[in-house]
Amino acid sequence: MIYSILKRDGREVVFDIEKIAAAVEKAMQSISYYDHLSDEEQENYHSYVRIMAELDWPAYLNGDTVFHQRVISRYEADGAPGVESAIYDYYGALYLKELEDQLSSSDVINKERLPLFHEALLLYQLGYYHGAVAILITQIIGITADIEKFLEKNNSSYDPETLELIKKRYGFDRKNDTARVMTAVVEGMSIDDDENEYGFLLGYLRFKLFHTHMPKEETEKHVNRHMVCHGTQLNYGTKEHALKVILCIDALAWVAEVISKNLAE
């Protein structure tokens, strides 16, 4: 099923929701807590992903069907402000504690990163968003490197088909940081976005977080790793900026868990 989304900046994005949903289902099954969705829940999930894609929130991996319905209801009633309110309510203190626990228990992520995650999440809760972003933005590639080292330690490597897809479709080699992150995601989720290049998480990482440049109007809502690390983006001190980076960290931690589970099978 191909969806067309008109984003807030006027751009049209076309993507195949069934391929994304199938990839998420396969990944969730591999970590053994996925309950098969009913037809109604599946349709709600499709609607949820469309809303997240339209509003540029990298939260589409969320598997909570109650939250899906809440987002849909808020969107229908209040549009983007309603959705953003629901997001901030949902991704609160309990979520942050669960995320920190997940990071701490990972057999993939380097334990020396844990104090950084703890401090960044604490800064976020205290409202020091510049500090939270500055710490976490450096850890995206860090988690990716941990995944690579984990595979190497276990005498494994990325599937050659994954590497070929990244090289052929996107023109990247794995020395490129963007390609390294995308390779990890594709490996973990078995995404083959043949119908669209904008599979949501891949698109967000590629065009927002890791793009070499971002227009000023985009920087008002998104963090760009290159611009932050080179000191050219200074306006990333908002709750929205920080939570979007946290969600990217969460997604990569989830991918790391999937890869670990797959390797153990």
Question: At which residue positions do the language-model features occur?
Answer:
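Short amphipathic alpha-helical segments and their helix-coil junctions
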Residues: 1-5, 110-125, 224, 228-231
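Helix-boundary capping/turn motifs
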Residues: 16, 91, 108-116, 219-223
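Long, C-terminal-biased catalytic regions of enzyme "large/alpha" subunits
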Residues: 1-35, 40
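An acidic intrinsically disordered interaction segment
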Residues: 96-111, 189, 210-215
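Internal, Lys/Arg-enriched amphipathic helical interaction segments that engage polyanionic partners
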Residues: 29, 34-103
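A long, hydrophobic alpha-helical segment
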Residues: 104-140
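A generic structural motif
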Residues: 7-11, 127, 234
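Amphipathic, oligomerization/interface secondary-structure segments
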Residues: 130-134, 138-265
